[in-house]
């Protein structure tokens, strides 16, 4: 007979930061009686999820991938943004073997170098400085046909801010004497991660066939036309950009295609559409035989050269739990499932022994402000059942609402999202109390606490650099101040009576009173 477990649950409230300023602060304005009560009754503090504390450049806002890697690994992990920017500054980037091979193969075949990625200074999924370095390197190596397929942001940047980036790259190509912007499309289409293949297919057809809803002779003109159609950057319809002869640039046999996003979750689907021989997400009219390179590792089953392979993280929380014969559950909606599994496990796809996973489908709506509660009720039902089963030592759960609805810029919807999560937490805490369990409530980064850009007056759809909550609902304890996300895994191990491995440099934040 299996011994009943007294589970320790880590509840990650995605996009839930703390901000003193209450103006357009959806979390402050939401009615959250459960969290209010827990903060009044139990020890709590604020911890850091941004900048140097998570291995990002100083002042850089945190994000979900980075947050979960730090949460699960128990150490500050040097992030891809910093790593690649350093390689560019040190002139190592221009000698990267995978990138050089791709450019050289296209030149040798008489083909073109196609560069695609999120053209943004946001630093969450990509950085336009990396894309510029790639364009410069391609031309320096002798490429005369260099085509940029720009995915537009408006989510980790202000909703209408792409013009300066497009103008800069127009000027860059003029200076280089070769290359041009070949297409633009919003990230809503090109970077879907929820198996909405009808969106991804529009980006694929744009790049491979030049098939587009609109066609212009200049990228800035195309963007301005999109704004006239009331499309913000994120939602810009497929737009092919023609050359002086009215021709579009499409991916052909013998070309190279270099994907410049460094974050994996929103890069996987479109990558698979280009390289998987048995791909069945949508009908591909053409499948060019080309040299495809990814900037970083997107998934174990994606077989393509990688410019910057992942650094191997050992003795993450999941691995330590496995070694100690502990059971664990990972649970979230589609939107954050990769975060509580792949990213939390330090970039490992396969579950650890004793690790179960539950995926709840996110609602099929165009944007989550249309259903701010998302699938939180179903998620909570499954989570409560798992707690009551007493099968698990540790449960990792992510509620995506604060982040996913925060990204829409819709204040009223974000308030509803926060209220939905609060009600769910009440159910979870009650279930834990029944079985003698405990929980830590925290977040990976901020978002919903700032819904308007105080400078521009536009909707603030990006993450923030605010501190995030850290609450312990359990035994009588004290909590250290000044913590960061990498302190969470060591804290969990201490609470369940396991030793902290040497690889974890984080410190336990919770101290049980004797």
Swiss-Prot record:
Top-tier EC class: isomerase
The name this protein goes by in its record: 2,3-bisphosphoglycerate-independent phosphoglycerate mutase
Binding site for Mn(2+) 2: 14, 64, 444-445
CC cofactor note: Binds 2 manganese ions per subunit.
NCBIfam families for the chain: pgm_bpd_ind, PRK05434.1-5
Record-level GO cellular component terms: cytosol
Binding site for Mn(2+) 1: 403, 407, 463
Active-site annotation: 64
Pathway: Carbohydrate degradation; glycolysis; pyruvate from D-glyceraldehyde 3-phosphate: step 3/5
Gene3D superfamilies reported for this sequence: Alkaline Phosphatase, subunit A, BPG-independent phosphoglycerate mutase, domain B
GO MF entry, a single one: manganese ion binding
Gene: gpmI
Sequence intervals crossing the membrane: none
Entry cofactors: Mn(2+)
Role of this protein: Catalyzes the interconversion of 2-phosphoglycerate and 3-phosphoglycerate.
Subunit record text: Monomer.
Organism annotation: Shewanella baltica (strain OS195)
Stored CDD domains: iPGM (cd16010)
EC numbers, comma separated: 5.4.2.12
UniProt record similarity statement: Belongs to the BPG-independent phosphoglycerate mutase family.
């Amino acid at each position: 007979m299996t011994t009943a477990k007294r589970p320790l649950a880590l509840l990650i409230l995605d996009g839930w930061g703390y901000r003193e300023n209450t103006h357009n602060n959806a979390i402050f304005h939401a009615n959250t009686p459960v969290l209010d009560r827990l903060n009044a009754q139990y020890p709590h503090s604020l911890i850091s999820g941004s900048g140097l504390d998570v291995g990002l450049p100083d002042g850089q806002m945190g994000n979900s991938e980075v947050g979960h890697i730090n949460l699960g690994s128990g150490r500050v992990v040097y992030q891809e943004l910093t790593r690649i920017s350093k390689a560019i500054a040190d002139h190592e980037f221009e000698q990267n073997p995978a990138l050089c091979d791709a450019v050289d193969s296209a030149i040798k075949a008489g083909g073109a170098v196609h560069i695609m990625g999120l053209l943004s200074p946001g630093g969450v999924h990509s950085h336009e400085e990396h894309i510029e370095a790639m364009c410069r390197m391609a031309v320096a190596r002798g490429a005369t046909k260099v085509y940029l397929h720009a995915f537009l942001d408006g989510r980790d940047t202000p909703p209408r801010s792409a013009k300066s980036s497009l103008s800069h790259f127009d000027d860059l190509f003029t200076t280089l004497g070769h290359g041009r912007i070949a297409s633009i499309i919003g990230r809503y289409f090109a970077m879907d991660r929820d198996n909405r293949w009808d969106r991804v297919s529009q980006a694929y057809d744009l790049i491979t066939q030049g098939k587009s809803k609109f066609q212009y002779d200049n990228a800035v003109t195309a963007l301005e036309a999109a704004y006239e159609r009331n499309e913000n950057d994120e939602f810009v319809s497929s737009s092919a950009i023609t050359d002086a002869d009215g021709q579009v640039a499409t991916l052909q046999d013998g070309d190279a295609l270099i994907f410049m996003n460094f974050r994996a979750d929103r890069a996987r689907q479109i990558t698979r559409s280009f390289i998987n021989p048995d791909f069945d997400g949508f009908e591909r009219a053409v499948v060019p035989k080309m040299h495809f390179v990814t900037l970083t590792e997107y998934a174990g089953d994606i077989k393509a050269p990688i410019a910057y392979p992942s650094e191997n993280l050992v003795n993450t929380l999941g691995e330590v739990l496995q070694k100690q014969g502990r059971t664990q559950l990972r649970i979230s909606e589609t939107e954050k499932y990769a975060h509580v599994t792949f990213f939390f496990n330090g970039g490992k796809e396969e579950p650890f022994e004793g690790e179960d996973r539950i995926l709840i489908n996110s609602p099929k709506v165009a944007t989550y402000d249309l259903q701010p509660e998302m699938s939180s009720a179903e998620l909570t039902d499954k989570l409560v059942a798992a707690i009551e089963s007493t099968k698990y030592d540790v449960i990792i759960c992510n509620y995506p609402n604060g982040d996913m609805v925060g990204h829409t810029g819709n204040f009223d919807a974000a308030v509803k999202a926060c209220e939905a999560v609060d009600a769910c937490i009440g159910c979870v805490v009650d279930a834990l109390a029944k079985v003698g369990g405990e929980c830590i409530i925290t977040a990976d980064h901020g978002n919903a606490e700032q819904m308007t850009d105080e400078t521009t007056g536009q909707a603030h759809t990006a993450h923030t650099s605010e501190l995030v909550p850290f609450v312990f609902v359990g035994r009588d304890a004290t909590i250290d101040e000044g913590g960061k996300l990498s302190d969470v895994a060591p804290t969990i191990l201490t609470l369940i009576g396991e030793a902290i491995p040497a690889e974890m440099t984080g410190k336990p934040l919770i101290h049980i009173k004797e």
